C-alpha cells in the first residue's frame, strides 16, 4: 500500500520554554503582518509567560506560537499578544486549537474573557477571533485602542481592541 500523501502531519502542542525563543523569533518574522519583537522579548514570552502561551511543532520544527498574558487588573482576562502560524501548518484550524489549549489548562480555568488588538485590514485575525467567539458561544466587540495618528504618529495602522466573552471554562 502506498503512503497517503494527503495525510496531515501530526502537530503537537506544548507549554513553551526558553529553548523555543529563537524559533519563535524566526517564525514571527515569517508571518507578516505580525510586528516582530526582540528575541529577548520572545524568550520572556516563552518562559515568564509560558502558562498563557503555546508552542506548536511538527517534529522539532516550530510551526505555530501564541503568546499572551493575564491583564494584571483583570486576571480573568487573557490578552493575546500574537498568534503565529507558519505556512506549513496553515488551513488546519491550528490558531483556534492553540488558543483553546491555553484556555483548557487547569491553571487557566478561571479565564472567561479574551482581549487582543487587530489592525482593521488583518482579515485572518478578525476571522480567527470571530470564529472563536462562535465556538465559545459568546459575543465579540471592538473599539479603537491605539489610533494611527494619536498613538502611533502615523507609523503604524490603528489597533482595534477586540473583546471576546464572557465564556465558560474550556475543557481539554
Curated annotation (Swiss-Prot):
Q: SUPFAM superfamilies under this entry?
A: Acyl-CoA N-acyltransferases (Nat)
EC main class here is transferase
This protein's UniProt keywords: Acyltransferase, Transferase
Q: Give the pH-dependence text from the record.
A: Optimum pH is 9.5.
Known InterPro entries for this protein? Acyl_CoA_acyltransferase, Ectoine_EctA, GNAT_dom
Q: Which EC number(s) does the record attach to this protein?
A: 2.3.1.178
Modes of activity regulation: Inhibited by zinc and cadmium.
Thermal dependence of activity, per record: Optimum temperature is 20 degrees Celsius.
Catalysed reaction(s) here are: L-2,4-diaminobutanoate + acetyl-CoA = (2S)-4-acetamido-2-aminobutanoate + CoA + H(+)
Listed pathway(s): Amine and polyamine biosynthesis; ectoine biosynthesis; L-ectoine from L-aspartate 4-semialdehyde: step 2/3
BP-aspect Gene Ontology terms: ectoine biosynthetic process
Residue span(s) of domain N-acetyltransferase: 11-165
Gene3D superfamilies recorded: 3.40.630.30
Belongs to which family?
A: Belongs to the acetyltransferase family. EctA subfamily.
Function as written in the Swiss-Prot or TrEMBL entry = Catalyzes the acetylation of L-2,4-diaminobutyrate (DABA) to gamma-N-acetyl-alpha,gamma-diaminobutyric acid (ADABA) with acetyl coenzyme A.
Assembly, in brief, is:
Homodimer.
Name of the protein described by the UniProt record: L-2,4-diaminobutyric acid acetyltransferase
Amino acid at each position: 500500500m502506498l503512503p497517503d500523501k494527503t495525510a496531515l502531519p501530526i502537530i503537537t502542542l506544548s507549554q513553551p520554554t526558553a529553548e523555543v525563543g529563537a524559533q519563535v523569533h524566526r517564525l514571527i518574522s515569517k508571518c507578516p503582518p505580525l510586528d516582530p519583537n526582540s528575541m529577548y522579548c520572545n524568550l520572556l514570552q516563552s518562559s515568564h509567560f509560558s502558562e498563557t502561551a503555546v508552542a506548536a511543532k511538527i517534529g522539532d520544527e516550530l510551526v505555530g506560537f501564541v503568546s499572551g498574558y493575564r491583564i494584571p487588573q483583570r486576571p480573568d482576562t487573557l490578552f493575546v499578544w500574537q498568534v503565529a502560524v507558519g505556512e506549513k501548518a496553515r488551513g488546519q484550524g491550528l490558531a483556534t486549537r492553540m488558543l483553546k489549549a491555553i484556555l483548557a489548562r487547569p491553571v487557566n480555568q478561571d479565564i472567561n474573557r479574551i482581549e487582543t488588538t487587530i489592525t482593521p485590514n488583518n482579515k485572518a485575525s478578525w476571522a480567527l477571533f470571530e470564529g472563536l467567539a462562535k465556538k465559545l458561544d459568546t459575543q465579540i466587540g471592538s473599539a479603537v485602542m491605539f489610533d494611527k495618528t494619536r498613538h502611533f504618529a502615523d507609523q503604524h495602522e490603528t489597533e482595534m481592541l477586540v473583546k471576546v466573552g464572557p465564556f465558560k471554562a474550556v475543557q481539554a
